[in-house]
Amino acid sequence: MAASLQAAATFMTPTSRVQLKSSPSICKAFGIESTGSKVSCSLQADLKDFAQKCTDAAKIAGFALATSALVVSGASAEGSPKRLTYDEIQSKTYMEVKGTGTANQCPTIEGGVNGFAVKPGKYNAQKFCLEPTSFTVKAEGISKNSAPEFQKTKLMTRLTYTLDEIEGPLEVSSDGTIKFEEKDGIDYAAVTVQLPGGERVPFLFTIKELVATGKPESFGGNFLVPSYRGSSFLDPKGRGGSTGYDNAVALPAGGRGDEEELLKENIKNTAAGKGEITFSVTSSKPETGEVIGVFESIQPSDTDLGAKAPKDVKIQGVWYAQLW
C-alpha cells in the first residue's frame, strides 16, 4: 500500500524542466532556436505554445482550403458574362475575350426600339447569330410507363455550340412579311446533352438551307439536318457508309428473326433529316440595321447512321442579325 502511494506521489509530482532533443526542421517550423544538440524548456509553457501553434496552423490550412474552393467555384458563381454589343465585342482583344464565354454569345443592341422597325425592301442579312439557352429532349420519364415529354438536359459540350456569321437574302414586303434564305456561314455545331437518366443524346444543331417566312412576331420554316456522322465514318467494327466492311456480324445462333436489326448495323444510313424553327423579333435599331429576338427549333437527334431511332430535340435561345 505504501509502495503504491509512493508511486502515485512520484507520478503526480510536477516536473519543472525536461531535456528535449532538438530537430532543425521542427525548430524552424515552430520558431525555436536550438543551441547545441539539446534544448531546455519548461514543459507546461512549451506544451501550451505548441498547442497554440497547432491551432494557428489549422486555421491557416482551413482558410487556404476555403480560398482554393472559392477560386474553383468562382466561374460558376459569377454566372454568364455580361452580354455585349457588336461594337464592344469588336473592340476587345483576343486575350480579353479568351476564357470569358463572350465568344459563345450573340451580341445585343442598346438604344433600339421594340419590334421590327425596318422599312420594306430587299436586304442582305449578315452576322446572323443563334445562341441556344435551353436544350430539351423528348423522351420517356424516369418513372415507369410515363408518357414521352420534353425533359431538361445537362449540356456535355463546351461553349462551342453557337451558330455565327450566317448570311443570306432577306426581303421585307409592304405588308410586313419577312422572307429569309440561309446561304452561308457557320451553320452547324455538334452538341451532346445528357438526360436525367444518364443517357447522352448527340445531335447536330443547324439551320442549313433554311427558308423562313412570316410576320416579324413569328416567322420560320423548315431546314435540313445533315447526318451527325459522315459516310466515311467507321464504327468500332470497321463498317462505314462509303468505306470499310460491308458486313462484320456473324450469323445469329437463333437463325432468322434478327435480320432487320443486323441490317441497321451493317448498312449505314447517312440520309438527312428535317427540322423546323420559329423566330420572333423583340427589338431593332434602324440606324445600324441590327435586329435581335428569340427562337425555338425542333429537330431530330443523331441516329448512329441509321441504327437508332432519332429523338426530338427542342432548342430555345436568342438571335442577332445585321441587315444591309
From Swiss-Prot:
<keyword id="KW-0472">Membrane</keyword>
<keyword id="KW-0604">Photosystem II</keyword>
<keyword id="KW-0150">Chloroplast</keyword>
<keyword id="KW-0809">Transit peptide</keyword>
<dbReference type="InterPro" id="IPR002628">
    <property type="entry name" value="PsbO"/>
</dbReference>
<comment type="similarity">
    <text>Belongs to the PsbO family.</text>
</comment>
<dbReference type="GO" id="GO:0042549">
    <property type="term" value="P:photosystem II stabilization"/>
</dbReference>
<dbReference type="GO" id="GO:0010242">
    <property type="term" value="F:oxygen evolving activity"/>
</dbReference>
<keyword id="KW-0464">Manganese</keyword>
<dbReference type="Pfam" id="PF01716">
    <property type="entry name" value="MSP"/>
</dbReference>
<dbReference type="GO" id="GO:0009535">
    <property type="term" value="C:chloroplast thylakoid membrane"/>
</dbReference>
<feature type="transit peptide" description="Thylakoid">
    <location>
        <begin position="51"/>
        <end position="77"/>
    </location>
</feature>
<dbReference type="InterPro" id="IPR011250">
    <property type="entry name" value="OMP/PagP_b-brl"/>
</dbReference>
<protein>
    <recommendedName>
        <fullName>Oxygen-evolving enhancer protein 1, chloroplastic</fullName>
    </recommendedName>
</protein>
<dbReference type="GO" id="GO:0009654">
    <property type="term" value="C:photosystem II oxygen evolving complex"/>
</dbReference>
<keyword id="KW-0934">Plastid</keyword>
<comment type="function">
    <text>Stabilizes the manganese cluster which is the primary site of water splitting.</text>
</comment>
<keyword id="KW-0793">Thylakoid</keyword>
<feature type="transit peptide" description="Chloroplast">
    <location>
        <begin position="1"/>
        <end position="50"/>
    </location>
</feature>
<dbReference type="GO" id="GO:0010207">
    <property type="term" value="P:photosystem II assembly"/>
</dbReference>
<keyword id="KW-0602">Photosynthesis</keyword>
